[in-house]
Amino acid sequence: MDKHRKLIRLQNFDYSSSGAYFVTICTKNRKPFFGEIIGNKMILNRIGDAACDYWQETPKHFSNIDTDEFIVMPNHIHGIVIIEPQHADVGTPYMVSLRKNRFGNNVKGSLSSIVQQYKSAITRWCGKNGFHTFKWQSRFYDHVIRTETDLKAIREYIVNNPMNWKADEYHG
């Protein structure tokens, strides 16, 4: 790993803590493996269908997560992951604590482990179905959702993403 790479995670943040997270997962070199935008609508191909199905199945593989709004785009996926409290917490479900994770971010049930398992599942599916050139970008982008206003704006961004494809930073 390049020690000079820009850190994209919040330092000393516990990414296994309950709250809502907006993630963007890109294909390697932003290659359009999932389909194409036609008439402001995302038209999924077989890999895109699998990516969509697997995203919807993700909560079945973790006892404390749910997914919210998401979209599979030609070369990336935007989605909201909600990590539920493991115990009886009092508070707003979309507010995220700033407690520190002393052991790093790749712990079971953390955002990184959820995304890694999702990416692995799609990669395995592609290999089994003859799509051997499929590859992910090695990392992913996240945003900690701290308020209901933030959540609403992100949901709107996700829903409108196909209509804004030509202006999207991920458009090739």
Predicted regions and their residues:
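Short catalytic/metal-binding and nucleic-acid-binding patches
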Residues: 1-172
